[in-house]
Amino acid sequence: MNDRITLAQAHCQPREKKEHKLGQARLAELLPQVPGWELSNNGHALTRTFQFDNYYRTLAFVNALAFIAHCEDHHPDMNVHYGRAVVCFSTHKIGGISEIDFICAAKTSALYEQGI
């Protein structure tokens, strides 16, 4: 049995020191684990656009994501539109991406896949 947990099963631990900022090699290793996400803001953030049938479903997703973000104490930047939400994770205190951004990206993708 594999005792490793997935990113979506992990929980966020504070990552506020500069040494927690991921380098290019680690980013390249983790990015395939969050399909659909891409580096943005000159490699300082993870971004994905989620599509929905209507505004109600978009807001339901955003509200569910807000609950997850609150529980993990790591909050994305979001742009909400009719039929889509753009979600962007970065660790502002380190000026880039840390492992908690990947954890939250994986949790966000899992939420979307549930059909919320």
From Swiss-Prot:
Highest taxon of source: Bacteria
GO terms for MF: 4-alpha-hydroxytetrahydrobiopterin dehydratase activity
Pfam families: Pterin_4a
A biological-process GO annotation: tetrahydrobiopterin biosynthetic process
Regions crossing the membrane: none
UniProt key word rRNA-binding: no
Listed InterPro entries: PCD_sf (IPR036428), Pterin_deHydtase (IPR001533)
Enzyme Commission numbers on file: 4.2.1.96
Keywords: Lyase
Disulfide bonds: none
Substrates-to-products reaction catalysed: (4aS,6R)-4a-hydroxy-L-erythro-5,6,7,8-tetrahydrobiopterin = (6R)-L-erythro-6,7-dihydrobiopterin + H2O
Gene3D superfamilies recorded: Transcriptional coactivator/pterin dehydratase
Family: Belongs to the pterin-4-alpha-carbinolamine dehydratase family.
NCBIfam families: PRK00823.1-4 (NF002019)
Protein name: Putative pterin-4-alpha-carbinolamine dehydratase
Organism per entry: Xylella fastidiosa (strain M12)
